[in-house]
Amino acid sequence: MWLELVLASLLGFVIYWFVSRDKEETLPLGDGWWGPGSKPSAKEDESIRPFKVETSDEEIKDLHQRIDRFRASPPLEGSRFHYGFNSNYMKKVVSYWRNEFDWRKQVEILNQYPHFKTKIEGLDIHFIHVKPPQLPSGRTPKPLLMVHGWPGSFYEFYKIIPLLTDPKSHGLSDEHVFEVICPSIPGYGYSEASSKKGLNSVATARIFYKLMTRLGFQKFYIQGGDWGSLICTNMAQMVPNHVKGLHLNMAFISRSFYTMTPLLGQRFGRFLGYTEKDIELLYPYKEKVFYSIMRESGYLHIQATKPDTVGCALNDSPVGLAAYILEKFSTWTKSEYRELEDGGLERKFSLDDLLVNIMIYWTTGTIVSSQRYYKENLGQGIMVHKHEGMKVFVPTGFSAFPSELLHAPEKWVKVKYPKLISYSYMERGGHFAAFEEPKLLAQDIRKFVSLAELQ
């Protein structure tokens, strides 16, 4: 017992020394050109143009013909979702997609919010911009940039947007009313893909910062999960004076002494200040971290090395694309869904919502360019980019959803984000928080902004 206390005290001192070395620095803003060919000498067109999602008979006919040629491989007996997407359940998805899913109706739903495009660094950047339908007298809306990840899209935010822009109509306080901007990452959905190598999270952060200033915002809030978390983090590192607050539901925590401490075992976890909830979500460590990462990172290795190869297959087969993406919406929502014959997909999402996200990738042909984002960010290795070793010095809020791929305790988050002012253990939910639990996420964003406004 005494030995454990002494060791824990020594570890605590080392951790305190490590955490207290707060060096405030900013990420260089830089510039870039990602369009085809050389950057033209003429000034880039900075106009903002309305955009509408459209479809055609030819597009739908081609989709149906490809779906009709779906060739299923029988799953192994009792395999459920342990081998990936179960082809027996895929038959149900395919039948619904072919016979009941109404893409024209879904296009109308996509167009319920105003869409725009604008040229930034040689690329046509797509975004939706939703203003409050009503405001309390004498109040102005708070601008909020929300950034998606992979294999999601701007559509993930469709259910949370009204809770932020029109809270009173949805039973929430109108103390904070937001003006929401949701861009598509370059190479995702309706944003043009780069013609050149190297467009990573830092370049995306700069592009989205330019978008916000082009829209007239000098100070704003930002929120993200998955790649959106890293993009927003980079923006906070790059232009901290413009970011009023950063809210995340996933953290890219660089390897540090602190993140290694759970290896000491569950008993030391309590000595080191981990809460009971942290211990519940981290242990058994081998199963919940090591084995989980091994099971769920196969796609990452492919996309961070040779994304174009698998992309050839996915861009040619809508059913293959659906299997590849929807498997993530199963396991990343809750890992236990691997035990179910249908992957639990319809427990949290409708088939319409899931297929709209697939259709955004399919109709734009952007699965390959979206996968390349892994190569651009991870292809050179880990801890080789300047931003990975930098801390973030803007007010930060964090939503810890219990079924996220890897739990990030408050102590880990605070190492990277010393100005963490809000950390919430969420009641339920997984990786696709805005899509799965929009009300819970909206409430936590509002809680964080209330604290950030006092800073």
Curated annotation (Swiss-Prot):
It is found in: Microsome membrane; Endoplasmic reticulum membrane. The keyword Transmembrane applies. SUPFAM superfamilies: alpha/beta-Hydrolases. The modification N6-acetyllysine is found at residue 439. InterPro entries: AB_hydrolase_fold, Epox_hydrolase-like, Epoxide_hydro_N, Epoxide_hydrolase. The chain crosses the membrane at residues 1-21. Its EC number is 3.3.2.9. It catalyses: cis-stilbene oxide + H2O = (1R,2R)-hydrobenzoin; 1-(4-methoxyphenyl)-N-methyl-N-[(3-methyloxetan-3-yl)methyl]methanamine + H2O = 2-{[(4-methoxybenzyl)(methyl)amino]methyl}-2-methylpropane-1,3-diol; 8,9-epoxy-(5Z,11Z,14Z)-eicosatrienoate + H2O = 8,9-dihydroxy-(5Z,11Z,14Z)-eicosatrienoate; 11,12-epoxy-(5Z,8Z,14Z)-eicosatrienoate + H2O = 11,12-dihydroxy-(5Z,8Z,14Z)-eicosatrienoate. Inhibited by 10-hydroxystearamide and methoxy-arachidonyl fluorophosphate. Residues 22-455 are cytoplasmic. This is Epoxide hydrolase 1. The lineage of its organism: Eukaryota, Metazoa, Chordata, Craniata, Vertebrata.
